Swiss-Prot record:
InterPro entries: Chromo-like_dom_sf (IPR016197), Chromo/chromo_shadow_dom (IPR000953), MRG (IPR008676), MRG_C_sf (IPR038217), MRG_dom (IPR026541), MSL3_chromo-like (IPR053820). The gene is MORF4L1. One of its GO terms (biological process) is double-strand break repair via homologous recombination. Component of the NuA4 histone acetyltransferase complex which contains the catalytic subunit KAT5/TIP60 and the subunits EP400, TRRAP/PAF400, BRD8/SMAP, EPC1, DMAP1/DNMAP1, RUVBL1/TIP49, RUVBL2, ING3, actin, ACTL6A/BAF53A, MORF4L1/MRG15, MORF4L2/MRGX, MRGBP, YEATS4/GAS41, VPS72/YL1 and MEAF6. The NuA4 complex interacts with MYC and the adenovirus E1A protein. MORF4L1 may also participate in the formation of NuA4 related complexes which lack the KAT5/TIP60 catalytic subunit, but which include the SWI/SNF related protein SRCAP. Residues 76-143 are annotated as: Disordered. Residues 125-191 are annotated as: Interaction with RB1-1. Residues 12-62 form the Tudor-knot domain. The modification N6-acetyllysine is found at K104. This is Mortality factor 4-like protein 1. Residues 94-227 are annotated as: Sufficient for interaction with SIN3A. Residues 284-305 are annotated as: Interaction with RB1-2. It holds the Pfam family MRG. A motif (Nuclear localization signal) lies at residues 96-107.
Length: 323
């Protein structure tokens, strides 16, 4: 009996594709193709992303760049935004004060390996047999790390401090119900907030290693913000404003334009993205401790970072664009 032949790849090196990262589809490029254990895998570069996020993915996470799949991409973005708004209203109650900052802020748990397909909204792929992580360092060859993430997916949950939840609700209410817009460019933009935080940490006499880690975390938050803002962090009513910003500032990172409310929205969504980073569970928990510390900083400075006076009523002509 002739040996079973290797499967034929559906995508070629250099091909423009759509690829799942978390629950959403992103434009990407197939850089390499490999067949291992009768399974086709692709080394993917997400368009516009730093090369640090290049990763090996199974064929189930890659789709052809055609109109039907582009429509699916738009539908997933819309569904994700609606789920985001609903989740915030359920989880954030104004006026409720608890010792949320003293509670454990990070919930990292390994998913039981269930075979899911991107069509079911999972966007990931797992193997039938789970294996414990074997990595001892946070930074290893990205090819090796991303191969292992197929075997061991980590679910990440970042809890928002209770002091900040009312601001999420107020932000939602001002925009979706009162039809106001956050004034742009922000008086204090995301870059400035992150720089202030880094300087604050340095002033507390951190070691060189901790200072380096803070700089890395700040750079990571900034990159996530710039990547996710246009697809996951805006309400429908804000989209015409976003289009105007892109037209007026085509080369400006959005972290130089938007401010604290949109940065806070990032932390509601960032857990789903962190599940696909090339980090082992221990390194991910360490990263989340840094994110928790940054959220504590936002809570401590919330009186100066968040204000209803930073919003303005949208003019009538804007309403016509937003319909």
């Amino acid at each position: 009996m002739a040996p079973k032949q290797d499967p034929k790849p559906k995508f070629q090196e250099g091909e423009r594709v759509l690829c799942f990262h978390g629950p959403l589809l992103y434009e990407a490029k197939c850089v390499k193709v490999a067949i291992k254990d009768k399974q086709v895998k692709y080394f993917i570069h997400h368009s516009g992303w730093n090369k640090n996020w290049d990763e090996w993915v199974p064929e189930s996470r890659v789709l052809k760049y055609v109109d039907t799949n582009l429509q699916k991409q738009r539908e997933l973005q819309k569904a994700n935004q609606e789920q985001y708004a609903e989740g915030k209203m359920r989880g954030a109650a104004p006026g409720k004060k608890t010792s949320g900052l003293q509670q454990k802020n990070v919930d990292v748990k390994t998913k039981k390996n269930k075979q899911k397909t991107p069509g079911n909204g999972d966007g990931g792929s797992t193997s039938e047999t789970p294996q414990p992580p074997r990595k001892k360092r946070a930074r290893v060859d990205p090819t090796v790390e991303n191969e292992e993430t197929f075997m061991n997916r980590v679910e990440v949950k970042v809890k928002i401090p209770e002091e900040l939840k009312p601001w999420l609700v107020d932000d939602w209410d001002l925009i979706t119900r009162q039809k106001q817009l956050f004034y742009l460019p922000a008086k204090k933009n995301v870059d400035s907030i992150l720089e202030d935080y880094a300087n604050y940490k340095k002033s507390r006499g951190n070691t060189d290693n901790k200072e380096y880690a803070v700089n890395e975390v700040v750079a990571g938050i900034k990159e996530y913000f710039n990547v996710m803002l246009g697809t996951q962090l805006l309400y429908k009513f804000e989209r015409p404003q976003y289009a105007e910003i892109l037209a007026d500032h085509p080369d400006a990172p959005m972290s130089q334009v938007y401010g604290a409310p949109h940065l806070l929205r990032l932390f509601v969504r960032i857990g789903a993205m962190l599940a696909y980073t090339p980090l082992d569970e221990k390194s991910l928990a360490l990263l989340l401790n840094y994110l928790h510390d940054f959220l504590k900083y936002l809570a401590k400075n919330s009186a100066t970072l968040f204000s209803a006076s930073d919003y303005e009523v949208a003019p009538p002509e804007y309403h016509r664009k937003a319909v």
